[in-house]
Amino acid sequence: MDAQIEKAIEIAWDPRSDQNLKEQAVQYLTQVRGDSSSLQACLNLFTRDPKAAEVVRLVSLDIVNNAIQTQHIDDQSLRGLKEQLHDYVRRTYASGNEVDPPALQNKLTQTLTFLFSSLYKEGWESFIRDFLSFTGHQNGTVDNLPGVVLYLRLLSSIHDEIADLMIVRAGGETKRNVELKDLVRARDVQIVAGSFQHILTYWQGNNDAIVEMTLKVIGKWVSWIDISLVVNQDILNLLFPLVGRNPNGGEDKVKDAAIDCFTEIVAKKMKPSDKIGMILFLNLGEVVSQLIASPALHDLRNTSSYDTDLAEAVAKLVNNVVSDLVKILEDTKVEPEVRAQAEQSLQTFLPLLLRFFSDEYDEICATVIPSLTELNTFLRKAQPLPPAYSAMLTPILNAIIQKMRYDDTSSYADEDELTDEAEFQELRKRLQVLQKTIAAVDEALYVDVLSNVIGNTFQRLDQQNGQIDWRDLDLALHEMYLFGELTLVNGGLYAKSQPSSIAAERLIVMMSKMVESGIASFNHPAISLQYMEICVRYCSFFENQTQYIPQVLEQFVGFVHHNHSRVRIRSWYLFHRFVKHLRGQVGNVAETIIQSISDLLPLKAEVPKESDDDMSSEDGSHDAADVAFNAQLNLYEAIGCISSTTSTPIEKQAIYARTIMNPLFSDVQRHLEQAKSGNAQAVLQIHHIIFALGSLAHGFSDWSPGEGKRAGQAPAKEITIEFSRAAEAILFALEALKSSSEIRNAARSSFSRLMGVMGVAMLPLLPRWIDGLLTQSSSKEEIGMFLRLLDQVVFGFKKDIHEVLNSLLTPLFQRVFASLSEPVTGTDDGIQLAELRREYLSFVTVILNNELGSVLVSEQNQAFFDPLVQSVTTLAKTVTNETGNLAASKIAFSVMTKMAELWGGPTIATPGQPITSSVQPQPTFPGFDTFLIERFHPVCWEVLREPHFRPMVDAQSKSVLNELAGLEHVIYMKTGNMFVEHLQGNFFPSMGVDGSGFIKSMVESPERKGLATFLQNWLKGRA
C-alpha cells in the first residue's frame, strides 16, 4: 500500500502526467484520505529512511494530519502515531542529522500540535518535556539548534491552537482548550518559563533568529501564564539589553521583537493595582524615552534611514500603556493611591504618545490614535476637569492640528500620489473626530487655539505679501472649514442679524479676513478649492455681509476658468451652489455672468471607444468626459438661478433664457438627422442638450406643484412661454429618437424639471411625453420611474389634471400592464418587476387619494376598470416569498380599501355597535356592494389560506394582515348585515370553516387592529 500511495502522489503532483492518469491518482488519494487503515502507510512514507520525495512526505503527513484533526482515528492508533513520530524526531532533530525542509517542518509542527491537543491530557503527559530534551546534546544545555527551533515552533503552535483569542472556536473546542491551558499551568509552565531564560542566555549574541523566535513565543504565552514567570529580574536582565541594542539605527528584528514582547506583557489583563505596579516596575516611561532619544528614532527621524519598524513597535507599546492607564482612571473603584500613580504615569506618557502621534509616517500616527481617542473620551466625561487634566488639552489639540497639515514632501494631486492623497484625507477624517472631542471638552480653548492658528496664518500671508507655504495656508483653511461646525450646531452664524455665539463671531471675522486677504488669487489648486468650499459652506455670512458678494462672484468667474482641471470641474458645482443659496442677494448680474462664462457652455459629447469596457476606457477618459459633462450642467443651472433673481425684470429673464436656449435648439436641428440614422455621437449630443435644457429650467425655478408654502412662486407667463419652446424641442427629439434609452432618460429627467417653469402648461403635453417615454423598448425600471414622476404631477395639479388624466389613463395602463405581464429573465429583472408593481399601485393610490377616482370609472376608461381591478386583486393575493411580493400586496389591499371607501356608499354599520338590519347598502354605482363582497372579500381569505403567509413570524406579512383586516372592516361598514348574512349562509359553509369567531370580531372590534389580532391568532391555531 505504501508503494501505491507514493506512486499516486508522484503522478498527481507531476505536471507531465497524463491528465486521465492524474485524475485517477487524485481520486485514489481522496479515498485514502477517508480510510483510517491507510494512515500507517502514510506515516511510514514520512518517517522512512531512505527518505521519500518531499512532496510525497508532505502529502502523506497531511493525510495523517487530517485524520487526527477530524478524530477519524482510534486511541490505539493515535498512540502508535505518537511513538513513531517521537522516534522520528529523536532520530532527526536530536541527533544533529540533516533536518527537514521548512515546509515539512511546518507540517510536522502542525501534526505534533494536533497530537498534543489529543494526548496531553492523557497519553502524552510528558510532551513538552520530551521536546525540551531535544534542545540540548547534554543535560541542562540548549545548544542543539534543530531541536531548539522545533521546540520553539511547537510552543508557538500550541499557543495558536489553544490560546489565541482572535480565533473563533466552537463551544466544545473552547472547553477543551481551557482544560489544556490549566494542565500546562499545573505541569509544565515553570519548565517552559525556565527554558525561555536558558535559550535567551545561550543564544543571545550567537543566533538572532533564535532570540527573535523566543521573544515572540514569550509575547504569546505571557497572555495566559503567571506574569511573575516572565516579569522577574532574571528575564528582564535579558530583555532590557535587547531593547537598547544597536542604538545607531538599521533594521534590527530582535530589538523590534523585544519591544513587541514588552507590549504583550503590558497588554496582559490584570487588576489595576497590579497593572500600574508592573508599569512602574518595568520603568517603561524611561525605557520609551531612551528609545525615542536613540539615533534610530531621533537623529535619523527626517531621513531615509529612519527606522519605521522600530517606531511602530514603540508606538504600539505606548498605545497599550496609555490605554491601560485610561482604563485604570475610568474605574471608579480604584484606590486613591493607584489613581494617583496612574495620573502621574499619564503625565509621563502623554508627551511620548504625542511624539508618535505627530510622526511624519501616518501608519505610525495611526498606531496611537486608539489610545488618544480613549484619553479624549475620558477627559470629556471627567467634567469638571481638574487642572492636571486641563493642561493636557492644549498639547493634544496642537498635535492634532499639526498632523492635519500636508507633509513637506507631499505634492498635491500628482498622478503618482493619488493613493497617498486619499489615505491622507481619510486620516484627516479620523483627526477631525479627535478634534471634535476636544471641542466637546473645552469649547473656549478650542475656539481660541483654532482662531490663533487661522488668524496667525492670515497675518503671515499679509506680512509676507503672499509668500507662504501652501501647506500652511491649506491647514488654516481646512481648520476654518471645520471650525464653522460649532456655529452650525448652534443654529447658524446669525440670530436676529447678530452673531449667534462666540464661535460665530470669530468665524465672521475669519470670513472677512479671508475674502479681503487675496487668498483667492493664491496660485495653488488646494487653496482655490478650500476657498470655494468655505464660501459655499458659510453662505449665510454673505447673506448678512452682502458687500462681499460681487468680489466673490468675480473670483468664482475666475475659478470656473481655472487651468487645473480638478479645480475647474469642482468650481462649476460650487459656483452653482453659491448663486443658488444667494439668489436673493446677488442682484441683477445675469448679463455680466452669462458673458463671462459663455465660452464654457458649448456642449461636446464624447462617445466611448469600441474597446472601452463598461463604458469606461483604460485611461479613464470617458469617465472624465462624463464627470465634466455632469459638472457642466451645474453652469446651466447656475445661469438659471442668476437669471431669475427677484431684482431681474421678467422681460430680461425671458431674454436670458432665450439667449441660452436658442443655440441649443439649433444644435438639436443640426444633429437630429444624423442621430436618426444611428450616429452615436449625434445621439449623445442631443442627450446632452436635453439635460442642459432641463438644468437651465431647474435653475429658473425649482418650484414643485403642490408646494403650498411656495404657491406664490408659480412660474411667470413669460418664462412659461420660453420654456414651452424647450419642451417642444425635447419632445421633437424624443418622438424622433424614442428607441434610444439615452434620449428617454434625458427626456424623463428634463420632464420633472420643466414642471417648475411651465406649471399647468405641461398638462396638455402629457400624452406626447407618455408616448415618447413609454415605448416598446422601455424597461420596467424606466416605466416605474416615470410613474413616480406622474405621482407628483397628479398630486400637484389635482384641480387641473382631470380631463388630461381621463384621456391618457387607458393608454398609460396598457403600457404598464404589458410590462407587468412580461416574463422575468433574471434577478435584476425580478427586482425591477417588483419596483414597477409598487409604483403602479402607488400611482393608483395617488389618483384615489386626490379625489380623481372618477377617472378610473369614467365612460372613456370603463372598459379598463375590470382589468385594473383584476391586476390589483392578483397583486394583493400574491404573498409568496419572491422579491417585493409582500410590499406590493400591502399597497394593493390599501387600494382596494380606498375603492371600498370611495364607492361603497355611506357607512351603514359601525363596528362595536348593534347591526341595523333594515338599512340597506347604498353604493355609488349599482351593484358595487355585491362587487365588494364577491370580488374583494374572497381575496382576503385566499391570502389567509396561503401556507407561505406567516404574519406571526414575518413583519411584512403582518403589515399585509393589517391592511387585509382594514379591507374586511370597510366592507362590513359599507354593506352591514348583507355581508354578515353572506358569510354565515354562504361563504364559510362552502369553505367548511367555522366563521363565527371572525364575524364576532369584525362586528365588535371598533378598530381594524382588533380584527387583525383575531386573524393572527386564528392563523396560529391553524398552524
Swiss-Prot record:
Gene3D superfamilies: Leucine-rich Repeat Variant. GO terms for cellular component: cytoplasm; nuclear matrix; nuclear pore. The keyword Ribosomal protein does not apply. SUPFAM superfamilies: ARM repeat. Disulfide bonds: none annotated. tRNA nucleus export receptor which facilitates tRNA translocation across the nuclear pore complex. Involved in pre-tRNA splicing, probably by affecting the interaction of pre-tRNA with splicing endonuclease. Transmembrane segments: none annotated. It is found in: Nucleus; Cytoplasm. InterPro entries: ARM-like, ARM-type_fold, Exportin-1/Importin-b-like, Exportin-T_C, XPOT. Belongs to the exportin family. This is Exportin-T. Keywords: Cytoplasm, Nucleus, RNA-binding, Transport, tRNA processing, tRNA-binding. GO terms for molecular function: small GTPase binding; tRNA binding.
